[in-house]
């Protein structure tokens, strides 16, 4: 048997294809017409276009490989038994197998080259002397998490890919690593065959979908799976090649396992011939034991292909990631008083995730300064959001916040603690609504609503309420056109279903909430005939791969984490708080009254280990329920409050309140003793938060630290690793690790679900 192998980028050279262009003039003319330039001049004339530029390299190699193949078949009168290609060369292998003709293949390659040629800021390097497992271990050990394995060229030649700066860091690491014979940076502009090609892949996927492919006449070995292409997954597999590892070693081992196999390199150079020679010397063949049940084996093989496509980047909704320019379907929620800091938001954005700056409890100036800082750090297309917490008592503060967000062109808002849609949210949506060229209504000001109740979800899944539109029209705050367009779209682009979580919580259970909310979403989309899907995310309790996997299996289009981010370097809270959080376990939280909604009895989940806050906060709420005023408390209780809880007199507290609260509130307190008591008790909640954030030594036991069990689970997960110490925890690295290990876990669980019933079915062995 014989396999024809086709080289990829790196094999190009000036002068290649000489003689072939004249021999196949009709195809050369066809190529010139498709490309818009002379393919012969590109390949043979030094003063013409640069054949080493990706945009030109790929079409040039494809054409030369294709013409070389036609000449080989004419000369030998024989077609191959198998075909394979390295990266770009795979298109020639598919052409040889009859999947498409010369013209179609060239159009695909032209588009691929254009997309990859636009990628900048990336780098690649070959590591000689280490196995893939050893290379991966070195990357993990030195926290080079932004680097991927791009090519497995031979057992001892591994190509890595990632941001150029990260590749430069890796050079120093590998050159000082035992057994590394050579670290060779490649002359490329992009991080090819890595997660950083995901956006280009999505565009290519849409492009390739318009083409029709014919049945394969011979098996073509896929770079992605190191196994033959499946006809019904041909387009998907070809697209996946762009951001996945080229498994060349295992591809050749698979072919070696077919029996006596001859390899012939078709195209310029002998790069693949050299790689195959080394693989034969350094590795053994792979084979499959004959299958007992072809139907079952085919099903299992298909499942394996599906599983192999599970990566950190593939989890969640592709449309969601595309809309927000994300690599990962991973968000980090806003945390009170800027604990979800500008540093946190920037770090996540640069890593292909999205964070929300926590505005609760901050002044407008503090929020605006943070927005300017974030915008100054991030470039176009890097996503960030601002958290907007509903203020039931002071809606005017929401008005001012929306004015600020609109003024600073903040286009993504996380709406938290809203019990329904409000006029300020309607106004925010109105100022970004328009029709695109296709006539679809789109909104540049996006809302992601965090919800935990179906009735709240329904209000955000519905168009803006008519009474609010009329009110805003009457106040000249929106236009007639804006009102008309708002009637066509939901109030929220996406909703995030929040199960039991740190901070404000309804104590919901994800297993019950997610199915109910996704069904409601489907019902509302049908009711209002929305054209664009509303995505449903999951939050609350997510701190381990198991929890994240459960969320995605329940249908989450994205996940949102909270508590685990509070115990990181980027969190804007005190080291003392982080020290306490690092020690907590899943049972170390409790529920306490929410300071901002004290009178209603709303709850927040807080840390209880090492502090008295939850017990003291609950005591205050108990007193508020039992008594009508501070004066009704006995002397002993008053003394306890002043000495143990407040560390100051009731009189001093009230003076402080009078300085900071609106005059209307103080006037009401003077007339209503119950309201005055509520203001005094609520002072303790602000006080306890400030103690924690500042790390005050004055009264550590009064620290109010919003937190859920997810952090306890996270602590157990990373116990014994570098991440056990919070000083080694960075939000971006945590996010990537969580998503990566979730993908691995999901892959393993899928494998176990589809494990063959016969030991001889589809088992890879060495021979």
Swiss-Prot record:
Its EC number is 2.3.1.39. One of its GO terms (molecular function) is [acyl-carrier-protein] S-malonyltransferase activity. Pfam families: Acyl_transf_1, FabD_helical_ins, NMO. SUPFAM superfamilies: FabD/lysophospholipase-like (SSF52151), FMN-linked oxidoreductases (SSF51395), Probable ACP-binding domain of malonyl-CoA ACP transacylase (SSF55048). It catalyses: holo-[ACP] + malonyl-CoA = malonyl-[ACP] + CoA. Its main location: cytoplasm. Residues 1-312 are annotated as: Acyl transferase. Keywords: Acyltransferase, Antibiotic biosynthesis, Cytoplasm, Transferase. One of its GO terms (cellular component) is cytosol. It comes from the Bacteria. SMART domains: PKS_AT (SM00827). In the N-terminal section; belongs to the FabD family. This is Polyketide biosynthesis protein PksE.
């Amino acid at each position: 048997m014989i396999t024809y192998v086709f080289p990829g980028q790196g094999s190009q050279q000036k002068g290649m294809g000489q003689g072939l262009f004249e021999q196949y003039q009709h195809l050369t003319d066809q190529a010139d017409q498709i490309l818009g330039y002379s393919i012969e001049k590109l390949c043979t004339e030094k003063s013409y276009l640069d054949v080493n530029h990706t945009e030109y390299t790929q079409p040039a190699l494809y054409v030369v490989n294709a013409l070389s193949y036609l000449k080989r078949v004419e000369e030998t009168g024989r077609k191959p038994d198998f075909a394979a290609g390295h990266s770009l060369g795979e298109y020639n292998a598919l052409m040889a197998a009859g999947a498409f003709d010369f013209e179609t293949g060239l159009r695909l390659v032209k588009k691929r080259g254009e997309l990859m040629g636009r990628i900048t800021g990336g780098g690649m390097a070959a590591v000689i002397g280490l196995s893939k497992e050893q290379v991966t271990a070195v990357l993990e050990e030195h926290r080079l998490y932004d680097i991927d394995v791009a090519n497995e060229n031979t057992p001892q030649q591994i190509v890595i890919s990632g941001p150029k700066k990260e590749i430069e860091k890796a050079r120093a690491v590998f050159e000082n690593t035992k057994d590394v014979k050579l670290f060779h940076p490649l002359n490329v502009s992009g991080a090819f065959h890595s997660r950083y090609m995901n956006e280009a892949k999505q565009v290519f996927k849409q492009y390739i979908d318009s083409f029709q492919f014919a049945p394969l006449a011979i098996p073509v070995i896929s770079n992605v799976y190191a196994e033959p292409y499946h006809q019904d997954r041909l387009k998907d597999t070809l697209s996946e090649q762009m951001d996945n590892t080229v498994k060349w070693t295992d591809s050749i081992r698979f072919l070696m396992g077919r029996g006596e196999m001859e390899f012939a390199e078709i195209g310029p150079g002998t790069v693949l011939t050299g790689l195959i020679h080394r693989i034969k010397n350094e590795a053994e063949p792979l084979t499959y034991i004959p299958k007992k049940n072809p139907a079952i084996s085919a099903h299992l093989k298909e499942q394996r292909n599906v599983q192999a496509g599970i990566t950190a980047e593939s989890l969640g909704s592709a449309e969601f990631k595309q809309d927000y320019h994300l690599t990962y379907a991973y968000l980090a929620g806003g945390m009170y008083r800027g604990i979800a800091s500008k540093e946190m938001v920037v770090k996540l954005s640069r890593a292909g995730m999205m964070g929300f700056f926590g505005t609760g409890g901050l002044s407008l100036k503090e929020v605006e300064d943070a927005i300017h800082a974030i915008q100054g750090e991030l470039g176009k297309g890097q996503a960030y959001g601002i958290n907007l917490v509903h203020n039931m008592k002071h809606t005017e503060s929401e008005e001012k916040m929306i004015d600020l967000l609109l003024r600073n062109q903040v286009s993504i808002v996380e709406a938290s603690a809203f019990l329904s849609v409000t006029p300020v949210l309607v106004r925010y949506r109105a100022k970004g609504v328009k029709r695109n060229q296709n006539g679809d209504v789109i909104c540049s000001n996006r809302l992601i609503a965090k919800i935990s109740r179906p009735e709240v979800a329904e209000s955000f899944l519905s168009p803006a309420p008519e009474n609010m539109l009329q009110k805003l029209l009457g106040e000249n705050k929106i236009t007639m056109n804006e009102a008309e367009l708002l009637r066509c779209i939901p109030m929220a682009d996406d909703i995030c279903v929040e199960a039991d979580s740190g901070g404000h919580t309804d104590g919901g259970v994800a297993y019950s909430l997610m199915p109910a909310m996704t069904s409601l979403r489907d019902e509302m989309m049908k009711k209002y005939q929305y054209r664009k899907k509303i995505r449903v995310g999951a939050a609350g309790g997510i701190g381990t791969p198991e929890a994240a996997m459960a969320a995605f299996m329940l249908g989450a289009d994205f996940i949102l984490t909270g508590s685990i981010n509070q115990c990181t370097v980027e969190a804007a809270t005190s080291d003392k708080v982080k020290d306490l959080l690092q020690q907590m376990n899943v049972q170390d939280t409790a529920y306490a009254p929410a300071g901002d909604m004290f009178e209603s009895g709303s709850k927040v989940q807080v840390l209880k280990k090492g502090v008295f806050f939850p017990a003291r906060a609950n005591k205050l709420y108990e007193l508020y329920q039992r008594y009508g005023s501070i004066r009704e408390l006995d002397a002993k209780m008053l003394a306890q409050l002043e000495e143990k809880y407040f560390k100051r007199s009731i009189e001093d507290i009230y003076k402080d309140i009078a300085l900071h609260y609106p005059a209307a509130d103080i006037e009401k307190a003077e007339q209503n003793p119950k309201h005055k008591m509520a203001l005094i008790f609520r002072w303790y909640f602000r006080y306890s938060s400030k103690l924690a954030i500042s790390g005050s030594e004055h009264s550590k036991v009064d620290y109010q630290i919003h937190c859920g069990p997810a952090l306890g689970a996270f602590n157990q997960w990373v116990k014994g690793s570098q991440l056990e110490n919070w000083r080694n925890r960075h939000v971006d690295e945590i996010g990537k690790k969580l998503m990566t290990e979730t993908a691995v876990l999901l892959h393993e669980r899928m494998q176990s679900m589809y494990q063959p019933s016969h030991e001889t079915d589809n088992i890879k062995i060495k021979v």
